[in-house]
Amino acid sequence: MVDQLAAGWLPAYGHEVVSSPSLDALAASGVVFESAYCPSPLCAPSRAALLTGRLPSEIGVYDNAAELRASEPTLMHRLRAAGYDTCLSGKMHFVGPDQLHGFEQRLTTDVYPADLDWTPDWRVPLSERLPWYHTMESVLTPGVCAASMQMDYDDEVAHRAVRKLRDLARDRARPFFLCVSFTNPHDPWELRPEYWDRYDPVEISLPSVGLVPRSEADPHSLRLRDMSGIDEVSLSDDQVRRARHAYYAAISYVDERIGEVLGALSAAGLADDTIVLFTADHGEMLGERGLWYKMAFFEPAARVPLIVSAPGRFAPGRVGEPVSLLDVLPTALELCGLEGSGRSLAGALEDGAVGDADVAVEYLAEGVRSPAVMLRRGRFKYVWCADDPELLFDLEADPLELVNRAPSEPELCASFGAEVERRWDMPALGAAVLRSQEDRRLVVDALNTGRPANWSFVPPAGTEPVQGKEDLYEFQRRARLDAPPRSSAMRER
């Protein structure tokens, strides 16, 4: 899993410039879902929804500072109860004291805070920017560096995952679920020269849709622009290209880390009976329509890669119907022979057929003042927010989402609106979000008074090499993938 990668920026989804050979190979051997959507175009809500199979509004993870209840069953709980070794290497953006949520083992710290400090406040005008709001800094300062926090982190994530795979190969007593979660290509975009130099600046195109005039932009886009200060910066074409160049380099960097993990899976002899699933928590606008980062319902922010590979179990293929990351949990359970609720895509992996079903996406965080939702049905995308006019796009005729068809399609909008009313009690949801924000702000004030609370995860020292209470020579012997039998001298110890 990676962070902030839109499907459209990968060659497997048609991009002609980005270099991602590891993901290309995975796509060639697996099933590519061409229209997969995140449950929310924001990190923590999307990840929590993926792991529980429930929308953010159903589990109370409204934003990046909302806590997933420890009592909420996750994919990891279900697999662990069935005997699986459940392990996480990398970020998952858990908030609160429970930093495992069913993972039996966690190999690294997280890369984002686990506290409540990033709680939005819908009562505050967007012009009063909170300190943690996205700014244009990442767009203005991308480039080459010898090292960065994000690359250091992802290097460690890959290394720990590779080591875990070797451990699993040595002891096959239990089936395993290993989640490897990288922070790239999330901004800031600062990469080592070998990744930056893979791209010629003349290859980097400008956005297909430039900055939309304020008089023509939808209200939510304007809110995001105001929140991040986009209109306060006049970007040159070279600056836009440089930011996109850095993002492409970040994709190549994380693709190489993914290749290391997949290579270790094969080297450990585990590839033939392991299902590999690749996705991202949300996308990246990357200057399209003048927007950057996520938090929007447009395709670059909401549509994510979803690739499932299990050579020998199902043939390579492509699925065009809309699906959701909410479908991952029931799919994984069915593939593992376990029961679960929700829409499983296991059948689609066999025959490519998904069936008709609306795909729902929510946004309940900073940048709105009331709940906003999106529905994808067939070729149409519908966006609803009580504060804004309806949006309706025909993605087959208008893939760049330039023409709002809502005024000319009242019957279709009425059908979508009825589905919104059926799925959500919007006044109650809005009140719940506001109440949650108020409660968390009080807790933040309390916990930042006196001795601050710290919920960040730190792997226990006893899990590290040569720090546990075991024989050093035996530990070193077992650390070899092709461990020899114990010598007579060791047996006598």
Q: What spans do the regions from the language model cover?
A:
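A contiguous, mid-protein "functional segment" used to position or interact
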Residues: 407-451
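Formylglycine-dependent sulfatase
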Residues: 1-384, 390, 399-415, 451-493
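Residues forming the ATP-binding cleft of Hanks-type serine/threonine protein kinase domains
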Residues: 396
